[in-house]
């Protein structure tokens, strides 16, 4: 093989033979290093050899002696290169020893020539000395040997190079290069072995990872199977629950039917008994007419002589008369005993049934929930085939049956003697007392809203069984009664009023139920072109003060438990209570007068027991909700509006609020009638009645559009009044009530429009929503503090013809920066993803009232950030669709973990509510919101506050912090709150400070010059308490104090030397003292305690709260001794013992 090295001017061709093989070289051929490694070594050697050859050629031109050495060195280098080339030639054909590779080597050599030229220039500068040239050549040889990678000793190579050229030196260099190559190959082999081991370990780990992934996949498949099984079990459970509810519903209806049948049977039995008694009484009356007419309370007078058909002597006739009289008396006594026993048995049965109902426990432990579960849903709960309440059934059946028994007893008592009359009257009086006690218990129960329907509509086919036979028999028998007996009977009957005929309803078929749901006074005329007259016309049969109907309150009466029923709203005692009394005594003048008295008594009893009193607060309970679902009176906006005390002066704002309130009451009745008309229209359309549907639809839509525009105009007027006029606290309360009620009415109207326009489709909105009817927000609430049960309430609103099969509990969620913070969230200052944020956040909807109460408790703080509440309910329709019913978000609030966070959190809430993403707001709008927050911070009632902010206070704040401008900006608010917030913090959390403020002992907003003017003419020791203007949140005491000045005066006398005298002058001035933290430090040292210990303060100026004017003048005050008015606020400390005379000296 020939290798050509291109120098600067010379080129040498070296013919080398194959080196002698050795065991080491043969062994290394088995495992060769990678080709990339050899290529790099080859390139390095070639570049170094080229450099050395060029340097040697340059040195040859300068010194002939050095030519030999340079040639020898070049030969050695060429031999090494030839050995390396032979190694490369022996590589397998798969290696990169191709001509292209050799061409790359030559290219590297050509590239290195340029570097050699630079080296030649450097060497030319050093050619003056031959010895230096030799040394340079030797160094170059050493570098060449090192670059070849032989790994041998540099000293040996240098010795070989410096020796004269010979064959032995050439062979030695070849052997050293082969050894270095062997060492390199050995190192490469070791590296490859370690790489192979690492690859095997990697493959092992990959196999383990694959096995783990297979296990995870198996677990996932098992979990999916378990989930599918659980879902199947849940579906089966749901089906079983539905079947169970259906069976309970059927059982409930069957029990109702049996009870109705029992009542009918009892009434029929009473009728039969009455008929028998009437027959006996008629016979006795025909035989003993004169004796009965002369009967009185003192005894039985002997019967007068009557012409009998005699078959013998008068004695026989007298005996026969006595026998007949004894037989009749025995029969009457037996009948009386039977009736009394029946009455006692019936009362015992009723007591047992009531005790069973009281002892009956449902799944949730609530009686109303038991009824709802038995019915399956609150929609089926409102079916007209059910009675209104269980207590009503007990009361009606007992009153109705007992009235018949009383008639029977009265009829039988006509022919009794004196003893019989007295015993019967005693029993009746006892029964009367029991009934009065029962009525008193009913009076004490909560009132419940209901509809009053036409008596005739419920009487025909649906009401109580007719009592015509009883009334007729009692009327016939009472025609022959005397004055005393008639008076007793009428008094007893007069104290008991018959139940309203619409209380009990007969079980009917679903078709009959649909007909029964349409009251006579509210029948929709299909032929009529509009329902405007129906909506605007008054309904005589239906109460004008009733509440909106809904899916929970159908046209018929709603069943309810006795715990939620009050007889004042349940029964109409004035309808037909006196007909029987007026018909009982139509033959006696005295009886007629007694009946008139009884009628008056009945009317008075009716007024006391119930009736609709327009002036009483309870008269508007039927108007209690602004939505169609029944609510408790506590949610009644109309009643709450009336409880708010009117303003001191009747202002145009007060008149406007009262006018909108009256319009709202009319709109409630309009929406109520609209509900009934729309429900009838939708039911007729679903049943296939297509007469004038389009005309009725257009009429409903036009009426709803008009009502919607009216409601929106009312909201606009209220908001305008809120932002343009400074209102009094009571007016603010009324305005908030009206805003809440009108907005709920508007939501209800939108549901009706949605239902009418869209209907129920799978892709269409469902006419149902949740509304927050009561909330304490916006407010700052402490962590772990639970809200009261009635402070946060949510109500379900639905359309007119909505059928809901079941529903889930309502769930409350936190909304923070438009993100829901559920139980698994950690955005509220916790890193535990499973930690709950709210306690009692899931509540069940009341199936009767449609309201859910949330006494929630917050378990984490919100880091001074505003959050809101959002409620979600899932309902299942009759079509099987599951729909999520959301609510709008609540007002913002902040949960704090420490009281020191209250100031900043309250400022954030106040700023968010006032500006509401605006740059500036009007001054009246800011004042109205500030007034509400101030009353809440000082824990005053918004309906009738003790001491709200006055006009003088607002003027002070406007001039001090806002420059008297009509608008408030963000910058002005920040400067205002930096002082006002700390003052409110002190007012809220310092002991006795809030009470002192409300009682007028603290002047909060006073300038220094105004204080000086107030105290200018006061006696020494008079003081006032106010908040410091220079130190926010600290209290200042301004008082009238004294200053003493000493003056020196000299006096001379002829006999004595001149003397100097000191005179003291006292002057008064107004002083100001800043209360320090040490003055009121400790749990039992308050501001009143500090004032009691300071002798400089004797009399305090107290504001007259009742006379605070709503003007910009200084409030009126009065001067009071501090120990008299502040004594209740002093801490009760143990008095120090009197140590005088006990051997101890006091410490001065």
Curated annotation (Swiss-Prot):
Domain SH2: 997-1122
Biased composition range(s): Low complexity: 1-36, 48-81, 106-178, 268-298, 466-517, 544-557, 574-610
GO terms (BP aspect): cell surface receptor signaling pathway via JAK-STAT; defense response; negative regulation of DNA-templated transcription; positive regulation of DNA-templated transcription; regulation of cell population proliferation; regulation of transcription by RNA polymerase II
Keyword Nucleotide-binding tagged: no
This protein's UniProt keywords: DNA-binding, Nucleus, SH2 domain, Transcription, Transcription regulation
Annotated SUPFAM superfamilies: p53-like transcription factors, SH2 domain, STAT
GO cellular component: cytoplasm; nucleus
Protein name: Signal transducer and activator of transcription B
Gene: dstB
